[in-house]
A protein has these predicted regions:
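Radical SAM enzyme [4Fe-4S]-AdoMet core and its adjacent flexible, acidic
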Residues: 1-75, 79-88
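Flexible mid-to-C-terminal extensions adjoining Fe-S/redox cofactors in radical SAM and related proteins
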Residues: 79-149
Length: 149
């Protein structure tokens, strides 16, 4: 996953072909009856989604999930890049319930609406633009896409 410091270490990230090889491996082990699953990461496209997981992935950041960082900042998920627009408040100065009900708009709007590539994708209604933790907030596009590579 190209998030956090991994963004600076391109040579260590799996290539698209290596990621597909890993997903093919997981699919094969599941077909053999091994209880292996691909974790919470991003939508894998209809080719892989139900083959390597028990159900379709949808990023729940800011919808069902909130996180409080060590400094008190309130965000949607600890894996999401810390930026002014992703920090929704601070537990030491803000009421959590009010933050939850009145903020988090950035996470309650489909990422697909922000990206032309995603908006035009046939799988957009399933993917919703992917995960917030792998979203490029400057370029307004997903860093990882299995739908429309």
């Amino acid at each position: 996953e190209p998030i956090g410091r991994a963004l600076e270490l391109e040579g260590y990230a799996l290539s698209d072909a290596e990621q597909r090889q890993m997903l093919d491996f997981i699919r094969a082990r599941r077909q053999e009856g091994y209880p292996v699953t691909y974790g919470c990461s991003h939508f894998l496209g209809l080719t892989y989604e139900r083959e390597v997981r028990d159900w379709y992935f949808l990023c729940n950041a800011g919808i069902y999930t909130a996180s409080i960082m060590a400094n008190g900042d309130i965000g949607a998920c600890l894996d999401i890049e810390r930026r002014p627009e992703t920090i929704q408040g601070n537990i030491f100065r803000d009421d959590f319930k009010q933050v939850w009900t009145e903020r988090f708009e950035i996470f309650r709007t489909s990422l697909a609406e922000q990206s032309k590539k995603c908006a035009e994708c046939a799988q957009q209604r399933y993917c919703e633009g992917g995960s917030y933790h792998s979203w490029d907030y400057d370029r307004k596009e997903q860093r990882i896409c299995f739908c429309n590579p």
